[in-house]
């Protein structure tokens, strides 16, 4: 049971890390941390999983390239704004509604579905993050919290139900649109840092879905 809890905590941390990475522009402190030993160790651990080896290497290469990029933090902030705070035509907007909604507009059914799920599981969106509920950062934060709920549940049947809810969420609320989101990033992200980030996210979600399927 302790191994189960520890593994789930690692899963949640990865979802929360990706949520924070895609929620806002990186600060100078963030960029420094990405060059540090802790991030190197973290990525080395992820890269030991065969399914994540290539996307982790690509992400590492993107981090290393930052070292030679003039005004790296400012340029990354510009990349973030150009991709994620732009228009559907010029950017790669991080909302599920853009990719799998019926209208192609914001706050479509995926956002409504997320609001229902957050109410059902008692997981609130951070008040300071004023974005539609189907923003990638909100969805990833929700997944991390759903994982921790399973850790805290003492009843075995309820805990199993929460694990199955995670599988459904990854398949129906993440993997149904983030591969298209990754392609949109690739087409518009000249430097490639955020493309590498989202490609790593897609690979991790696919791996996590396989893990959860094996838990059935």
Swiss-Prot record:
Q: Name one GO biological process term.
A: protein complex oligomerization
Indicate where this protein is primarily found. Answer: cytoplasm
Matches recorded under SUPFAM superfamilies: TorD-like
Pfam families in the record, alphabetically?
Nitrate_red_del
Q: Name one GO cellular component term.
A: cytoplasm
Any signal peptide, and if so, which residues? none
Top-level taxonomic group = Bacteria
Claim: Coiled coil is one of the keywords in the record:
no
Q: Where in the cell is it found?
A: Cytoplasm
What family does the entry list?
A: Belongs to the TorD/DmsD family. TorD subfamily.
Q: Extract the NCBIfam families matched here.
A: PRK04976.1
Give the protein's function: Involved in the biogenesis of TorA. Acts on TorA before the insertion of the molybdenum cofactor and, as a result, probably favors a conformation of the apoenzyme that is competent for acquiring the cofactor.
What is this protein identified as?
Answer: Chaperone protein TorD
Organism this protein belongs to? Photobacterium profundum (strain SS9)
């Amino acid at each position: 049971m302790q191994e189960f809890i520890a593994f789930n905590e690692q899963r949640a941390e990865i979802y929360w890390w990706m949520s924070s990475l895609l929620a806002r522009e990186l600060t100078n402190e963030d960029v420094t941390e990405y060059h540090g030993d802790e991030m190197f160790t973290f990525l080395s651990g992820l890269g030991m999983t065969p399914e994540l080896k290539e996307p982790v290497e690509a992400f590492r290469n993107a981090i290393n390239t930052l070292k030679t990029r003039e005004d790296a933090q400012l340029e990354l902030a510009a990349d973030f704004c150009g991709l994620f705070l732009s228009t559907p035509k010029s950017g790669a907007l991080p909302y599920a509604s853009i990719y799998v909604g019926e209208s192609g507009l914001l706050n479509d059914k995926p956002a409504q579905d997320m609001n229902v799920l957050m109410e059902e599981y008692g997981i609130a969106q951070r008040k300071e993050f004023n974005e539609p509920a189907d923003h990638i950062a909100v969805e990833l934060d929700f997944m991390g919290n759903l994982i921790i709920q399973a850790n805290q549940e003492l009843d075995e049947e309820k805990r199993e139900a929460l694990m199955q809810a995670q599988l459904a969420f990854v398949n129906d609320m993440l993997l149904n649109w983030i591969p298209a989101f990754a392609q949109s990033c690739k087409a518009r992200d000249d430097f490639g840092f955020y493309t590498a980030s989202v490609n790593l996210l897609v690979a991790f979600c696919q791996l996590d879905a396989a893990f959860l399927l094996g838990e059935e």
